[in-house]
Amino acid sequence: NEGPLGYNFPKYEERANRMRESLEIIRRLLDGEKLNYDGEFYQTKQAKLYSPPKNHIPIWMAAGGPKSANLAAEYADGVMISVKDPKDAYEKVIDPAKNKTKELQKDNLRLHTYRWTMFAKDDEDAWEALKSWRGLRAPNRLQEIDPAALRETADSLPKDEIMSKFSRASSIEELKEIYHPLVSDFESEIVTI
């Protein structure tokens, strides 16, 4: 979203540091603090929520790799994971987040998992249904500004390569098979279909 607004997309280290500061500010404000904050990226002076929440508001953070998983475990209440390959999601996100949670002696790691799934009768139907979403899994999607260019990139790749980035179901039973492991194996508190 930065590119269309004329901003450069920062490298991961800066994005992570910005997220860390943001989460710290948000949590402290939600907890009722009158906040003076002087960070590298953000500053506040006497910031306060004058209508604070009555109950704890959980902060969820998406993570796609071990660094973000550690950041989520430390600063958020839960981690959101896009599961393409369940084994890969466990190794790259869930295990690091759980290990960081144990290291910090926290007991509140909550999981929200989701999968990009097409409900289609066959591959042709699925390919057509994916038309406006194909670029979502194209290479360089974090650097490219124009969604149309991402779709063109995706359309230039072998169809199977793009289709393999999504799950496909043609019946409710197949849909259950795709999503059941997110509950049974991952123990997700929230599963998005």
Where would I find each of the regions flagged by the language model?
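Active-site-adjacent structural elements that line small-molecule/cofactor binding pockets in enzymes
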Residues: 1-193
